[in-house]
Amino acid sequence: MTLFEKVSKYADADIAMPVRKTEKSAGYDMVAAEDYIIPSIWVMFQEAKEIWPVGETEFVTMEQMAKFTKETGCKPTLVSTGMKCKLDQGEWLQLSVRSSSPLKYWLMLGNSIGVIDADYYNNPDNEGEIFFQIYNLSPFNIQIKKGEAIGQAIILPYAVTDDDAACGERTGGFGSTSK
């Protein structure tokens, strides 16, 4: 059974459940669970340069970039939907920003698309709470108000190779499969 539910933290909150707006819509519209200010990436970079001066370099390693991100806080804003999604075996949930978000508001997902695996549901770290990683490419900070549509969730099937031998189990929440 595939279904959306509120996470316990937002059980009594007045948040719209994800819905498809038309009969032929692929995506379920997702809304922000609370108010957020999405900082301008340009402002973040200016502030980050004061904390972590950037020298004349062609590249940094992934380890250096992780340190930069941790020390400066220069990263996408995690916008909660207050929702989780129970998926059947063989399904995954794709998260995408609304098609108007980059065009009108300069908002994009930091990870291009979000991938929610079936075993993310009810994980011990965050109950499977669905977040959108949002970057603001505009020169201004942008406010997203509680209840505003922030993206879409599309339920999709997946396939595995004939020789697939995956047998591990999820041990955490957000980003835990790469830890």
Locate predicted features.
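DUTPase catalytic domain/fold
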Residues: 1-179
